[in-house]
Amino acid sequence: MYKRQAFCAWQTEYLLKGLGPAARYVQRYRLPTEAEWEYAARGKDQNEFPWDNADVASGNGCFYANFKPENGNYTKDGNLITSKVGIYSANSNGLFDMAGNVAEWTSTVYTEAGVEAMNDINPQLKYNAAKEDPYRLKRKSVRGGSWKDPETYIKSAWRTSEYQNQPRSYIGFRCVRSLANTTSQKSTKSKKR
């Protein structure tokens, strides 16, 4: 299990410990799918960037996210590399740092077809590659761009891939939970008295 998945599992267990019987209704933390990530990043108006305007080209975009606004200029926004989480405004969904700062892992297997390859039968393109699997099966979709990327890479629709077992200083992750009101996959144990 990779560290990002292990953290989601730890965060779930931490939450469940304090909830008692109500824990069975809590959805587990996980990485978002690629489609979920893009929907969340675009905001309520489905913007090209997570904010409400396209000031990136004028150089004002560096005040909306931590990215490289000009060729070789990493510090125009005042941050040499990663910035403190939440210092830029939230998007219309109330989410911070959906572009720039660090790109983000998704749980979706990377394919050239992208979200067009998803359908009702396979909405997530999930596959957890084992160590012995060929490298081509170990690519995961990465979204959002990072502090080292130019404007093109921080658009909400931009996507790339990295090998799931290769950590990168410019890629982080975001934990999400589904909102469904169903019983959690982990059942609570009742004690006999």
Summary of predicted features, one role per range:
Residues K3-S156, S184-R193:
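Functional-site microenvironments in short loops/helix caps that host divalent-cation chemistry
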Residues N165-P167:
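Solvent-exposed, polar surface segments
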Residues S169-Q185:
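Short, structured beta-strand segments at or near domain termini in extracellular proteins/domains
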